[in-house]
From Swiss-Prot:
UniProt keyword list: Membrane, Mitochondrion, Mitochondrion inner membrane, Repeat, Transmembrane, Transmembrane helix, Transport
Subcellular location: Mitochondrion inner membrane
UniProt-listed InterPro entries: Mito/Peroxisomal_Carrier (IPR052217), Mitochondrial_sb/sol_carrier (IPR018108), Mt_carrier_dom_sf (IPR023395)
GO MF: ADP transmembrane transporter activity
Function field: May function as a mitochondrial transporter.
SUPFAM superfamilies registered for this protein in UniProt: Mitochondrial carrier
Gene Ontology CC entries for this record: mitochondrial inner membrane
Name under which the protein is recorded: Putative mitochondrial carrier protein TRV_02148.2
Pfam families documented for this protein: Mito_carr
The organism of origin for this protein: Trichophyton verrucosum (strain HKI 0517)
Membrane topology: Multi-pass membrane protein
UniProt family annotation: Belongs to the mitochondrial carrier (TC 2.A.29) family.
Length: 385
């Protein structure tokens, strides 16, 4: 009997700790994504607007049969000039943060839903074996499914970054120009870019094996990522232009010849994009470290307050004794009385667990402490038999 009670009580306490810890981890991750996205959104907005501007200028130059290769200093100068124009007044600074709400929602949803969908598909197995190809297929399906729902957010975000308009105006323009399907105008390019994201780690591991590299460094991964980004850069620009509603390729042009003389832009934009992603990752990790303890303490205090609200409703041992003696025959009262005392004592000590924050302070659960406390409950429990 004691073993059964110990298991039930331990399971309930661990479940309580797991639920609070899971909520704390989710809140921390969401906070980190939101802050890192807000920190780097102005630079991302500037790069997006420059990509659209260069694509439009290239399309106009094709009509005029004139070409010109931009130098890195020209691109950097355009970035500085565009940033200076928007920093001068309040309206310009607001334009830099246009689309921030959609960016945060999109990043948060993708970072949390893609692993969840992948885990759900993996749990169902789908009659597939655990091979690299099947794992890659599940990753692609997960990303494609989630991005099907987040693509409208990406379209609205880019439109707002380019035009600086509000969400309602942007949505009205899209619906008036292309209908509801306009919200998914760049979904095809998004799917191809999903393939890049899923295949890149596999290619990196294959190259490591091929070259006999025992250790894979960050530099090697960045070089491979830069090569992959350079290959699909034109497609990435096409995605941005489709979302922005800007025509970047003239009639009869092929995707491969869109930026024949703009490789300088390609290389610089790839480097800036990688820098942006590295900064976002580092800032996200830093924010996670800073906010984890704060969120944990907040969740712990919330749990403590909830249990404190329930504590006055706990019956005292004397009230339990009187109630059992009034409603149960004398022959059966003692076992029920012992059980009632035991459960009342267990609930009170459970409140003590939450107040001390067992298992929450380190974003995990202290199984040993919980087990020891459950052992105390069992020792205080009624004797068998």
């Amino acid at each position: 009997m004691n073993d059964l009670r110990s298991y039930d009580l331990y399971t309930s306490l661990v479940s309580h700790s797991d639920s609070i810890t899971s909520a704390s981890n989710t809140l921390t991750e969401g906070t980190a994504i939101a802050l890192s996205t807000a920190l780097l959104h102005p630079l991302d907005s500037i790069l997006t607007r420059l990509q659209v501007r260069y694509a439009s200028q290239h399309h106009n130059k094709k009509k005029d049969n004139r070409t010109r290769t931009r130098k890195p200093l020209d691109v950097l100068g355009d970035i500085v000039d565009l940033a200076a124009e928007n920093v001068k007044d309040a309206e310009g600074r607001a334009v830099l943060y246009a689309g921030l709400r959609e960016a945060i929602c999109k990043q948060t949803a993708e970072n949390m839903l893609v692993p969840a969908v992948y885990a759900a598909l993996h749990a169902r197995r789908l009659n597939l074996g655990r091979t690299a190809g099947n794992e890659l297929l599940l990753s692609l399906v997960s990303m494609a499914f989630v991005k099907l729902f987040t693509e409208p957010l990406g379209t609205i975000m880019v439109r707002r970054q380019v035009t600086g308009s509000g969400t309602r105006c942007v949505v009205d323009d899209i619906l008036r120009q292309k209908g509801v399907g306009g919200l998914w105008s760049a979904y095809g390019a998004t799917l191809v870019l999903c393939v890049r994201s899923c295949v890149l780690p596999v290619v990196y591991l294959a190259l490591r094996r091929r070259l006999g590299m025992k250790r894979g460094g960050l530099l090697g991964m960045l070089v491979l990522r830069a090569i992959a980004e350079s290959v699909v850069y034109r497609l990435a620009v096409m995605q941005v232009c489709a979302r922005a509603g800007v025509k970047a390729v003239g009639n009869g042009s092929k995707l491969g010849s869109t930026y024949t003389n703009d490789y300088t832009i390609c290389v610089l934009m790839v480097c800036l994009g990688l820098l942006l992603e590295v900064i976002r990752t580092l800032s996200s990790q830093g924010v996670t470290t800073v906010t984890s303890d704060v969120v944990t303490v907040a969740m712990m205090r919330l749990s403590a307050v909830m249990l404190y609200m329930l504590e006055p409703f706990l019956l005292s041992e004397q009230a339990i004794t009187d109630s059992v003696r009034e409603n149960v025959d004398a022959g059966a009262s003692q076992p029920l009385l012992d059980d009632a005392k035991y459960m009342n004592n267990a609930v009170k000590r459970a409140i003590s667990i939450v107040n001390r924050g067992i298992g929450l302070a380190s974003h995990g659960r202290d199984d040993v402490a919980v087990a020891e406390l459950v052992g105390d409950y069992v020792e205080d429990g009624p004797e068998d038999g």
